Amino acid sequence: MNYSEKLTGAPPMTEVPLELLEEMLWFFRVEDATPWNCSMFVLAALVAIISFILLGRNIQANRNQKKLPPEKQTPEVLYLAEGGNKDDKNLTSLTETLLSEKPTLAQGEMEAKCSDVPRVHLPDPQEPES
C-alpha cells in the first residue's frame, strides 16, 4: 500500500466521493521540486548565455561600423548638396544686399502717405541737427 492509497482510502463516515479526493490529492500534491527547479535554472542560464552572445555581437558590429570609412556619396547627392549651397549663398548675398541698402521711406513717411493727413517731412535721423 503506497502513500496515495492511504490518503484516498476514505473512512466510511465521510460523504466526499473517492474521485474528488483523488483529484484534490493530485491538485494539492507535494512532490520534490528538484526537477522543476533544475529546469528553471537551465532555462535561465540559457537565456543569459543568448543575451550575452547578442550583446557581444552588437558591440562588435558597432566597433566594425566605426572602423569603416564613410560611404562615398553618389553624384546625385553631391549635386543636391551643391545646389543647396548655391541657394544658401544666393540667399545670404540677397539678405546682405537688402540689409545694406538704405530704406527709401521711413516708417512715418509711409504712414503719412497711406492716410489723408497732410504730409509732414521728418528729418533724416542720420543728418546732424544744427
Curated annotation (Swiss-Prot):
Main localisation: membrane
Basic and acidic residues compositional bias, start-end: 110-124
GO BP of this protein: bile acid and bile salt transport; bile acid secretion; positive regulation of protein exit from endoplasmic reticulum; positive regulation of protein glycosylation; positive regulation of protein targeting to membrane; regulation of protein stability
UniProt keyword list: Cell membrane, Lipid transport, Membrane, Transmembrane, Transmembrane helix, Transport
Regions that span the bilayer: 36-56
Membrane topology, record value: Single-pass type I membrane protein
Residue ranges of the region described as Disordered: 99-130
Pfam families named among the record's database cross-references: OSTbeta
Extracellular side stretches: 1-35
Locations listed in the record: Cell membrane
Cytoplasmic compartment spans: 57-130
Domain comment as written in the entry: The transmembrane domain (TM) is the major site of interaction with SLC51A. The extracellular-membrane interface is absolutely required for transport activity. The intracellular-membrane interface is necessary for establishing the correct membrane orientation that is essential for the heterodimer Ost-alpha/Ost-beta complex formation and transport activity at the cell membrane surface.
Record PANTHER family: ORGANIC SOLUTE TRANSPORTER SUBUNIT BETA (PTHR36129:SF1), ORGANIC SOLUTE TRANSPORTER SUBUNIT BETA-RELATED (PTHR36129)
Function: Essential component of the Ost-alpha/Ost-beta complex, a heterodimer that acts as the intestinal basolateral transporter responsible for bile acid export from enterocytes into portal blood. The Ost-alpha/Ost-beta complex efficiently transports the major species of bile acids (taurocholate). Taurine conjugates are transported more efficiently across the basolateral membrane than glycine-conjugated bile acids. Can also transport steroids such as estrone 3-sulfate and dehydroepiandrosterone 3-sulfate, therefore playing a role in the enterohepatic circulation of sterols.
Family: Belongs to the OST-beta family.
Protein name as annotated: Organic solute transporter subunit beta
Species of provenance: Bos taurus (Bovine)
